[in-house]
């Protein structure tokens, strides 16, 4: 089965056939923010693609041939070429399909976007630590650390327009959005209390057709996380 909302393939499943000519395939998981990066770039660029969801708690044996680490996202083209790691997949798509560039051509502007991404890079591990934290006393420290990272991002928005890279969404917006989109479901939105520019940016992103097409239902996401943290093989298909 294929499609963003399709059930995932697990251990014992047959591997999918070759990628059709003129398409690209992405191995994904419905709730994964890293895979969401790749899916958003595919949509933003209008690239024909198919989605194969992988059960990350019950991985198919053949998937390790696509990525020995067993992680999503993975891109595969009709030539059998494989690309892994979310940021690398997005850069590959921007270069392999140059019709609608998401990174700016100007070297300095592109460097600025990459500097913002470097500043943002501490956010996903902090959110992951918060999700996995079993001790309530850890929560305030993690919240404070996350708030500080958001303040650093805010300080870098000196030439702020509607979006992080200018007047319209670009690569830096799509590479950061999945974690901001999950703040409400994780009850972390108050960490933005002292970053008004980031809050305005979030409001602008919610109006973007690509960003808004990836819905995160708070209750469903929390139930998924509960199952995922218990290593349940049912987690990745929760809600289907």
UniProtKB/Swiss-Prot annotation:
Domain (GST N-terminal) ranges: 22-101
Keywords: Acetylation, Cytoplasm, Oxidoreductase, Phosphoprotein, Transferase
Active site per the UniProt annotation: 32 (nucleophile)
Highest taxon, organism lineage: Eukaryota
CDD domains found in the cross-reference section: GST_C_Omega (cd03184), GST_N_Omega (cd03055)
Location (main, coarse): cytoplasm
Domain (GST C-terminal) ranges: 106-227
Enzyme Commission numbers on file: 2.5.1.18, 1.8.5.1, 1.20.4.2
Biological processes, Gene Ontology terms: cellular response to arsenic-containing substance; L-ascorbic acid metabolic process; negative regulation of release of sequestered calcium ion into cytosol; positive regulation of release of sequestered calcium ion into cytosol; positive regulation of skeletal muscle contraction by regulation of release of sequestered calcium ion; regulation of cardiac muscle contraction by regulation of the release of sequestered calcium ion; xenobiotic catabolic process
Residues where N6-acetyllysine is found: 57, 152
Catalytic activity of the protein: RX + glutathione = an S-substituted glutathione + a halide anion + H(+); L-dehydroascorbate + 2 glutathione = glutathione disulfide + L-ascorbate; methylarsonate + 2 glutathione + H(+) = methylarsonous acid + glutathione disulfide + H2O
Family under the similarity heading: Belongs to the GST superfamily. Omega family.
Protein name (Swiss-Prot/TrEMBL): Glutathione S-transferase omega-1
Organism: Mus musculus (Mouse)
